[in-house]
Amino acid sequence: DFDGGGSASASAFYADNDRIQCWDPWVMQSSDRTAYDYPETHNRVMKIMQFALQRAKEQNAHDHEGPRLWGVLVTGVDLWDSVCVNNMRIVDLNLAKDGIDSADWNVKVGHQWDWAIRKTRFHQLTAVCKGLVKQGVRIFWETHLRLTNYSFGKNEEAAKWRPDWEKASNNFVFQIITMNREDTYDDETGKLLKSEYTATFDKCKTNAQLQGQKRTVLVTEVGKPAVFLGLPELYDGSL
């Protein structure tokens, strides 16, 4: 739960469900000028995911009894990407002593920011997630978006809202669902009347019928109770 969204949702909507466990991946510094210990945060993420993978393997044994691991949601995958970038600077290339230290420019140019290292770190999480999928566990990644065409400042024409890390994901992600909010305003007063939250299947390798389809998941209107419709495809097997 990198961005805290998982624990917030669990607290707000599933307070009585003790089967939803939220894990904070961040490791704080005990006495330093930076808040986070990036190397130990990377290690903690790996320990959490490897624990989940071990549980998934154990529950597939014929004599297993008790609760089963249904799925794993990783919130703020873009923040995991930032952990990998900082570790590339601090640990792998020794360009900075912590997450806020400026790198020596000559050294940085010499190494050209070795993005292959960052990519390798990032895909440690990907590898464990793929292992969980093979064990029958559902994996969901939630991420913030950036307006980009992956030229990284060279030419941002025709930019779209995309995950920063998607270009380096090697097509490991089979489905991409983009969430949007569409607002309706009063023509005379300009006040907000209604908000419609939608989910668009921008990518769906496992079900061609869903490709490009859009669903309304939540509707809020001023003075009326919110109407939650959800996204049935997430749990009915059609993905």
At which residue positions do the language-model features occur?
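Conserved P-loop
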Residues: 1-61, 65-73, 79-82
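Conserved nucleotide-binding/hydrolysis micro-motifs of P-loop NTPases
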Residues: 3-8, 27-29, 77-80, 145-149, ...
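Short, low-complexity, polar/charged sequence segments that are solvent-exposed and flexible
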Residues: 17-21, 91-94, 218-223
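P-loop NTPase motor core
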Residues: 62-168
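Phosphate-binding/switch region of NTP-binding enzymes
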Residues: 123, 129-223
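Glycine- and charge-rich intrinsically disordered segments
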Residues: 229-239
